[in-house]
Design a protein with these regions (language model features):
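Condensing-enzyme catalytic core of the thiolase-fold
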Residues: 135-495
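Acyl-group transfer acyltransferase/transacylase scaffold of fatty acid/polyketide systems
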Residues: 1-156, 446-453, 486-487
Length: 495
């Protein structure tokens, strides 16, 4: 077995519950400090560790810590029940109670509110003093407090990172269970016919996997659901789990001020399901785009706004930007922003191929002389966003910070489908200005980089004008993961 680092809990990569905590794991967590042998005051009982009463007593600090750690790791915390029982246990005998905050907690306001309803409460909070001396939180910034993603060669973000780190090329011939390529493939297009000159894409391993029962959806309805919506529901739920949020009553965010912004580019399943399954009572909510974000809100019992978006390859960027604007305007307090692409119908391949944007030879050859178009790809991802000051106050796990976001359109391009370097240059400058950053502060740029001759040239030209020249010793690396995982269209600018 590989030796475990001293500062890493065994098998635990974040706060989580498990029904199986071994004695060896508990020994590791509790440790071997001599303080564990110290005796507690006789008769001391700690309410809330072993259940709803305080009938269990502990003789030493070690016994108490082991019991507390076991419950923390293996039992779900029902805070509403715990606080209600605590309040009842205090009864009318305690007119005044003192509360000591041992660390940052998003539940402090709820606990204090319940206790203050029936008695006087004094709060000892050293954190307020220490935090007031720290750095001020940057106004206008958005925190990413949770995220998820899966795509070609990856079932989660760790596997996704491994695809990038190991330089994998995920393109393959279109699987037979997606579509019959031979029915539409040709070496040269004919006028009026739906044909395609490409045979490749980058695909998820299990596009049909979906636990319908977990989401309270019948098998009949699940079959009619757009796979894009199924995967977004799973991705968003996973992102919320990583952020520590659920549909429970102890949230630090008002469910009426939680929004969903979801982007998709095509309606492949509408064609597939209508042809194979006809119309059903569940067809409407199965394929109508509005039900993509709506299902998540319904699942989580949120009553904030939901938005179904389509701005082609900029879909996920639009979702994130609009979510940021809603947060900064304080229209909402938390937002889920994401997008999904699942390739399941040949017709979207045919008209993209006829438009001349798809590679006939394989994956995206970003910034290469032999670039001949992009390779389509599956992907599903979601971000959980909050105002930075709220994320700090709620002790959220801040994964990254969005200093600024912006969107525009290439209205002066040579055609509606081509890029405009001038528009991109203007947008880059706007983002830097709003973020109060100098171009030399930027240390890496993830490019759009689809592998088209016109698009790649325009993008690199805009980046060069804004971020060059650079001082000696401060180079600017650029990259594009589309060379690994293809172009996932609506999702592409968030992965």
């Amino acid at each position: 077995m590989k030796k475990r680092p001293n500062n890493e809990l065994p098998g635990i990569r974040g706060l989580q519950h498990t029904l199986d905590v071994s004695a060896a794991d508990m020994d590791y967590v509790v440790g071997n400090s001599t303080l564990l042998e110290m005796q507690l005051r006789p008769g001391l009982k700690v309410w809330g560790i072993t259940g709803d009463d305080a009938n269990t007593s502990y003789s030493s600090w070690g016994d108490l810590l082991r019991a507390a750690a076991l419950q923390t790791l293996s039992q779900r915390l029902d805070l509403v029940k715990i606080v209600s029982n605590l309040n009842a246990c205090l009864g009318t005998s305690y007119k005044h109670v003192g509360v000591k905050l041992m660390g940052p907690s998003g539940h402090a306001a709820y606990i204090l509110g319940v206790l203050k309803a029936t008695r006087q409460v004094s709060v000892d909070d050293d954190l307020q003093t220490s935090s007031s001396k720290g750095e001020s939180v940057r106004e206008g910034a958005i925190a990413i407090v949770g995220m998820s993603g899966k795509g070609p060669g990856s079932e989660d973000l760790d596997e996704f990172w491994n695809v990038i780190a190991t330089g994998q090329d995920c393109h393959q011939e279109i699987p037979a269970d997606r579509m019959d390529v031979d029915e539409y493939f040709c070496t040269k297009h004919s006028p009026g016919k739906c044909t395609m000159t490409c045979r490749h894409g980058c695909f998820m391993k299990h596009p049909g996997h979906f636990d319908a029962k977990f989401f309270h959806i019948s098998p009949r309805e699940a079959l009619l659901m757009e796979p894009v919506h199924r995967h977004f529901l799973m991705s968003a739920y996973e992102a919320l789990e990583t952020a520590g949020y659920s549909a429970g009553q102890t949230r630090t965010t008002d469910p009426n001020k939680t929004a969903v912004f979801f982007a998709q580019s095509f309606d492949d399943w509408l064609k597939v399901s209508h042809h194979a399954l006809g119309c059903d009572a569940y067809t409407l909510q199965g394929v109508q785009r509005a039900f993509g974000p709506g299902r998540l809100a319904f699942q989580m019992k949120w009553e904030g706004p939901t938005y179904a978006l389509d701005s082609a390859c900029a879909g996920s960027t639009s979702a994130i930007h609009l979510a940021c604007m809603s947060l900064l305007s304080k229209d909402v307090d938390m937002a889920v922003a994401g997008a999904t692409t699942i390739l399941s119908d040949p017709h979207s391949f045919t008209f993209l191929s006829k438009a001349g944007v798809l590679s006939e030879t394989g994956n995206c050859k970003t910034y290469r002389d032999d670039a001949d178009g992009y390779c389509r790809a599956d992907f599903s991802g979601a971000l959980i966003l909050k105002r930075l000051e709220d994320a700090v106050a709620h002790n959220d796990n801040i994964l990254a910070v969005i200093a600024s976001s912006a969107r525009n359109h290439s209205g002066n391009a040579t055609s509606i489908t081509t890029s405009d370097a001038n528009a991109q240059e203007s947008l880059f400058k706007k983002v830097l200005r709003n973020a109060r950053l100098d171009p030399n502060d930027v240390s890496y740029i993830e490019m759009h980089g689809t592998g088209t001759q016109v698009g790649d040239k325009a993008e690199m030209g805009a980046v060069s004008k804004v971020f060059l020249p650079r001082p000696a010793g401060n180079p600017l690396p650029v990259g594009a993961i589309k060379a690994n995982i293809g172009h996932s269209e609506a999702v592409s600018l968030s992965n």
